[in-house]
A protein has these predicted regions:
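Active-site-adjacent substrate-binding region
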Residues: 1-78
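His/Asp/Glu-rich mid-to-C-terminal helical/loop segments that flank catalytic regions of hydrolases
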Residues: 69-100
Length: 100
């Protein structure tokens, strides 16, 4: 399961950034559920494009973070992901809904 604590483009325009306390709670839940996870970045955020709805939810005062299954070559003719990553994502989402 991959977490991305910051999303946005052109600096802080349309962005969100998960705070340290929320990340600590999330890490505790994942560790207690024995979920394999990692933190990642989107890459060159100044190029724009893509994006998620996390910043919209953050505008309502929600604690937000983007998460998903790691994908190699996203939006290319051949995308690759692992069954183990999908399994860990299911475990992680279940743990989040039960304990976070």
């Amino acid at each position: 399961l991959t977490f991305n604590k910051f999303t946005g483009s052109r600096g802080k325009s349309g962005s969100n950034d998960a705070n340290a306390e929320y990340l600590a709670q999330l890490r505790r839940v994942m560790d207690e559920a024995d979920v394999a996870y990692q933190f990642a970045e989107l890459g060159k955020v100044d190029l724009g494009g893509g994006g998620t709805i996390a910043y919209i939810m953050a505008n309502y005062g929600m604690e937000v973070i983007d998460s998903g299954v790691a994908v190699l070559n996203m939006h290319a003719p051949y995308e690759i992901s692992s069954k183990a990553d999908v399994y860990e994502a299911v475990k992680g989402y279940k743990a989040f809904l039960l304990y976070a």
